[in-house]
């Protein structure tokens, strides 16, 4: 199957594209796009991979589902398009960055600039039906994104994996803590941010680790 995805990722994930679950997933996604409003736009499904080639990844942030409101999702977890109001979790992410490293919140919630520096902003599920959170869960995306995380965890070293909330922590449970830095805390959602997200200092801790391993820091 010829999947339109960045070449280095295509090389590493090619075995997934040939599996039965991925063929079934592809048919499901095509059917959904033909019948319903689906986010993100089709050409942006693999945006996280396309902006951040396999060998350029330094940090992985794991999300769950794309935003399901109009104009929000563009293939990067927690990120929204330019001009779109910041969702509550993103507001809290920027608050923690300010508290941690002193950087003021930007004027846009578009995190493409992180992706281009080597931050893989990966949702577990890459598509969603408009206004129906979780509507594309358990259709195969989770197996595919597990494979991407596993490839990075096994074939790269000294990466930072940022796992906010129980869902991301379960998804990253197999990552070798001796080979990578795994940062876990509560989710930035307003429901849980005060239970350990605020004050986690993940942004400075990620940069300290990158620097200690000879990598340039992320400009958060």
Curated annotation (Swiss-Prot):
Protein name: Uracil-DNA glycosylase
GO cellular component, one term: cytoplasm
Similarity remark: Belongs to the uracil-DNA glycosylase (UDG) superfamily. UNG family.
NCBIfam families assigned to the protein according to its UniProt record, in alphabetical order: PRK05254.1-1, PRK05254.1-2, PRK05254.1-4, PRK05254.1-5, ung
GO biological process: base-excision repair, AP site formation via deaminated base removal
UniProt KW keywords: Cytoplasm, DNA damage, DNA repair, Hydrolase
Native organism taxonomy: Bacteria, Pseudomonadati, Bacteroidota, Bacteroidia, Bacteroidales
Reactions that this protein is recorded to catalyse: Hydrolyzes single-stranded DNA or mismatched double-stranded DNA and polynucleotides, releasing free uracil
EC number: 3.2.2.27
One Pfam family this sequence matches: UDG
Enzyme class label: hydrolase
Function: Excises uracil residues from the DNA which can arise as a result of misincorporation of dUMP residues by DNA polymerase or due to deamination of cytosine.
Molecular function terms, GO-annotated: uracil DNA N-glycosylase activity
Active site positions, chain numbering: 65
